[in-house]
Amino acid sequence: MKKAGIIGYGRFGRVLADLLSKKYAVRVYDIEKVADDEGVEICSLDEVLECILVFIVVPIRAFEQVVKEIATYTLY
C-alpha cells in the first residue's frame, strides 16, 4: 500500500488522516506526543518524509519553520 505522511496531527491533521487511511498507509509526525489512532502510524519526521505524499498541516505560525526544516532533507 502506498504511504501518505502528515506533519501536524491536530484537528485538521486527524480529519485528513481519517480520509487518507481509506487508500493509503498513513504516517504522522507531530511535535507533541500523540497516541496512535486506528489506521495511523506515529513516526519520526524522517519516516514521514519517505512517503509518496506529504501534507503539512501545522498552525500558520509554525508553517515557515517547518518548511525550512524539511527543506534540509533530500526529498523525492
Across the structure, where does each feature detected by a protein language model lie?
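Short, Lys/Arg-enriched, disordered terminal segments
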Residues: M1-K3, L45
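Short N-terminal micro-motifs specific to bacterial/archaeal maturation
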Residues: K3, E38-G39, E50, V54
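Conserved N-terminal Rossmann-fold NAD(P)-binding element of oxidoreductases
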Residues: A4-G8
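Hydrophobic/small residue at the entry helix of a nucleotide-binding pocket
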Residues: F12
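NAD(P)-binding Rossmann-fold cofactor-contacting core
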Residues: L19-E38
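Active-site regions of enzymes building and remodeling cell-envelope glycoconjugates
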Residues: D36-L45, T74-Y76
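Rossmann-like NAD(P)-binding element
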Residues: L45-T74
